[in-house]
Design a protein with these regions (language model features):
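Nucleotide/phosphate-binding catalytic cleft detector across ATP-hydrolyzing
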Residues: 1-146
Length: 146
């Protein structure tokens, strides 16, 4: 059986509670709550733990949201901004360019949203992108014959 990952390969679990980024040879390099804070002009102010700390405490002009809810992307623009910020962090830490990536997405994501997620990851430097719904990723991870 061939390995799913090779050098400079990444896995992203874009989850409703947390987002994780795995880099082959380094393990999990990012594990953050799937939360983003932004102002009323659309500027991202915080993501992950920093944004989660603002939940219920932010002033009126700052929205703090979980852009993925109940297995679907409820706010695509915020999801895109959050994913970009997380990728920028992971790529800067590991100094990775020209990578392949598997992105696990909630099962309720539409084909249009899958293509948009793929495009975001490509813009960040991915040479190949594979979108995999989370139930399938879980089955593969459990060693089930799929």
């Amino acid at each position: 059986m061939c390995s799913l990952f090779r050098a400079k390969d990444m896995g992203i679990d874009l989850g409703t509670a947390n987002t994780l980024i795995f880099v082959k040879g380094s393990g999990i390099v990012l594990n953050e709550p799937s939360v983003i804070a932004g102002n009323d002009k659309g500027k991202t102010l915080a993501v992950g733990s920093a944004a989660k700390a603002m939940l219920g405490k932010a002033p009126v002009n700052i929205s703090v949201v979980r852009p993925l809810q109940d297995g679907v992307i409820s706010d695509f623009d915020r999801t895109a901004d959050m994913l970009k910020a997380f990728l920028e962090t992971a790529l800067a830490v590991k100094k990775i360019r020209n990578f392949r990536v598997v992105v696990g997405v909630p099962s309720g994501v539409t084909e249009v949203e899958k293509r948009a997620v793929e495009e975001i990851v490509r813009q960040m430097g991915a040479t190949e992108v594979f979108i995999l719904e989370e139930p399938m990723a879980a089955a593969i991870g459990a060693g089930m014959p799929v």
